[in-house]
């Protein structure tokens, strides 16, 4: 009997190692609710304790529960509100089966927590990852900790699917007014570039320099709130991804 994907995702208990630690964290079988104790999340750096995250998290998982079986073997876009807000994703890649797994407010530690149920259980054809701005802005995390968490995400994906392409997008520019100063984002992106360079089947997408102004900040005509891109921004992101998809041989859905 074929077990539905959602059932598998919600009943699977996995162990993830704390990044840089010795203890292993047993991820609860049901990750559809944000943990009451965010400090229990895997990974390094401060945990996200923004009060609104639990509601967004639960809402997104309720939506995905309805489409879990349909979302297999697609290109999974994984991230935070910037990914969640990509409403034209399917239209922008009409020849690909795209699956949006963005959660507003999420961080690298949250992605590590939900990676198996939200992504790996879907047998993805490829993964596009953009994550880290909330680690810097909401949590004041050290860029090296964020980079280590991203490295662990890449590792976890390739432990399950060793040959699928992973496209890691640089953290987009924002502003010090949003607690996301250019120097910290640039430092994080340098570390991301270094890690991607040494990871097989992993590709870097420049989503910083294509947007940043002369000060390294987000231009208001593309990021109206200095954090989230508008339609022009998503179009530029699409254009940056297309040649990478071709290089990685991420093929159109037949």
Q: Could you tell me what each predicted segment is?
A:
Residues 83-100, 108-147, 151, 156, ...:
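Oxyanion-hole/transition-state-stabilizing segment in secreted/luminal serine hydrolases
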Residues 12, 24, 173-254:
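Catalytic His-Asp segment of secreted/periplasmic serine-dependent ester chemistry enzymes
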Residues 72-74, 95-97, 122-126, 161-165, ...:
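Loop/turn elements at helix/coil->beta-strand transitions in domains of secreted/extracellular proteins
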Residues 146-169, 186-202:
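Charged, glycine-enriched surface loops/patches
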């Amino acid at each position: 009997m074929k077990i539905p994907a959602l059932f598998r995702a919600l009943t699977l208990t996995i162990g993830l190692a704390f990044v840089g630690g010795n203890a292993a964290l047993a991820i609860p079988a049901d990750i559809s609710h944000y943990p009451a104790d965010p400090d229990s999340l895997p990974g390094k750096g401060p945990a996200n304790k923004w009060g609104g995250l639990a509601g967004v998290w639960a809402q997104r998982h309720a939506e995905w529960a309805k489409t879990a079986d349909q979302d297999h073997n697609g290109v999974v876009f994984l991230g935070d509100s910037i990914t969640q807000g990509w409403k034209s994703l399917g239209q922008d890649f009409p020849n690909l089966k795209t699956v949006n797994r963005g959660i507003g407010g999420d961080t690298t530690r949250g992605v590590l927590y939900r990676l198996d149920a939200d992504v790996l259980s879907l047998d993805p054809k490829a993964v596009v990852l953009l994550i880290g701005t909330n680690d810097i802005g909401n949590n004041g995390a050290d860029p090296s900790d964020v980079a280590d968490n991203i490295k662990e995400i890449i590792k976890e994906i390739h432990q399950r699917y060793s040959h699928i392409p992973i496209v890691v997008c640089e953290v987009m520019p924002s502003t010090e007014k949003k607690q996301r100063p250019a120097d910290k984002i640039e430092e994080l992106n340098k570390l991301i570039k270094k890690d991607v360079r040494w990871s097989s089947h992993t590709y870097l997408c420049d989503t910083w320099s294509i947007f940043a102004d002369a000060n390294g900040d987000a231009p208001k005509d593309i990021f109206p709130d200095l954090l989230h891109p508008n339609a022009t921004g998503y179009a530029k992101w699409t254009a940056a991804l297309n040649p990478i998809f071709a290089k990685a041989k991420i093929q159109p859905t037949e």
